Amino acid sequence: MDIAIQHPWFKRALGPFYPSRLFDQFFGEGLFEYDLLPFLSSTISPYYRQSLFRTVLDSGISEVRSDRDKFVIFLDVKHFSPEDLTVKVQEDFVEIHGKHNERQDDHGYISREFHRRYRLPSNVDQSALSCSLSADGMLTFSGPKVPSGVDAGHSERAIPVSREEKPSSAPSS
């Protein structure tokens, strides 16, 4: 069963009336004033209009691409190291978990944790799945698709996260 994948900017169809940033994946990054009071910017200056697309695309929201021959997940995990990340496949799902213990930053102590779960298409070759973390903190999980009728090999296993030294060239669509 394939699931339709929606691009993140569709979620902002209602513009400033839709406070979705509060629920997006922002690991330790503060909220802006317009996140709590979306009407404030339009009341101060009726000509001011904040960029809807830039904030959503740069926000750390995951992106899933599924084309004819490949399935790819991009996830911004810039606050986590490969040791903090666990990626495993269970049946038709990939689970990505990140957690780092409490550590000191500029404002005190902080700990972060997230858990994402994605359904894999039925024709993804699970024996050839790979996962890498770029230098700029972009996690890329990918797997080739097999022709229909060929066994894709479903089993439970952990996928190691490899470290890349170059920045990601991923989701800037």
From Swiss-Prot:
Q: Which residues bind Zn(2+) 3?
A: H154
- Which residues carry a glycan? S162
Record's compositionally biased regions (Basic and acidic residues) = 153-167
Q: Which UniProt keywords apply?
A: Acetylation, Chaperone, Cytoplasm, Eye lens protein, Glycoprotein, Metal-binding, Methylation, Nucleus, Phosphoprotein, Zinc
- The annotated region (Disordered) lies at 144-173
A Gene Ontology biological process noted in the UniProt record is: lens development in camera-type eye
Q: State the superkingdom.
A: Eukaryota
Cellular component, GO annotation: cytoplasm; nucleus
According to its UniProt record, which protein family does this protein belong to? Belongs to the small heat shock protein (HSP20) family.
What is this protein identified as?
A: Alpha-crystallin A chain
| Gene name of the record | CRYAA
